[in-house]
Amino acid sequence: MRGDLIRALAELNKRGPFDAVLLETTGLADPTPVALSFFKSAVVNMNFKLDAIVCLVDAKHVMQHLTEVKADNAVNESVQQVAFSDKIIVNKMDLVSAEELDDVVGNIKGVNSFAKIICTQNSKVDLKEILGISSFSIERSLE
């Protein structure tokens, strides 16, 4: 993934300046290699800035993913995504009760007390909440 991403960003850089480049990983992907790509390549590091890692979770199903025990001490990707995120969008809040939503938010805060949490439905989020927010910190991410 990292090599492909670095090559893709280098190609984009040749086309001219962009206001923003949004990267969406597939499902339960480890965000660490993506984030490290911004620091491992001189071309990427000089021309792109990792602004924030935003995680979108499904309010109805996130708890089963966060509490899932993986075989052979494998990493729980859901926990890793939440832990590594700067902002977490809890979507489909209309599909759970207020108590369930409080439980979801509480569990997310238990994994990541630094991230701002936005609860919404139909993925409606003001772009000012997720673009140009300068939330990423490599130091915090390594904690």
Locate the predicted segments by residue.
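C-terminal accessory "lid"/substrate-recognition subdomains
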Residues: 77-143
